[in-house]
């Protein structure tokens, strides 16, 4: 019987890592998310056709994707409640990253459910960091502006 070696999965968040959600909100609502009433913001975005499908890349998003795409990353993206954003996010990924890229959509709090020991998550928010690490995953808290550091950090953890 052959020995099967499972490789760790590299997961990459979408909003704030590859996709510029904040810029999209600013273009649509004339203010950044932190300056808006969240209930009103989500109501407006839900009513905006193809909001997520039409979001721009983050400034370093294409360079980051270029650096990690050969590791076959899986997009692991949190979605707002109501099921209205999943198709848009999948459409963006198919168009910009390729139809062969696996995309998992879920509530942000459920992201750690996809973690196995050694799996890596690149995410701009640290709300699930402790839960990811508790499952023996590796967590890279990503922020724009230091791309070379993050690429080295990803490669070091693979």
Q: Language-model features: where?
A:
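Short, structured coil segments at secondary-structure junctions
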Residues: 69, 99, 134-136
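Short catalytic/ligand-binding loop motif for oxyanion handling, primarily in non-cytosolic enzymes
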Residues: 19-21, 27, 73, 82-86, ...
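Acidic, Mg2+-coordinating phosphoryl-transfer loop and its flanking beta/alpha structural elements
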Residues: 120-154
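Conserved Lys-Pro-Asp/Glu-containing loop-to-beta segment of HAD-superfamily phosphomonoesterases
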Residues: 9, 104-132
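A short, structured active-site edge motif that brings together acidic residues
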Residues: 74-84, 90, 95-114
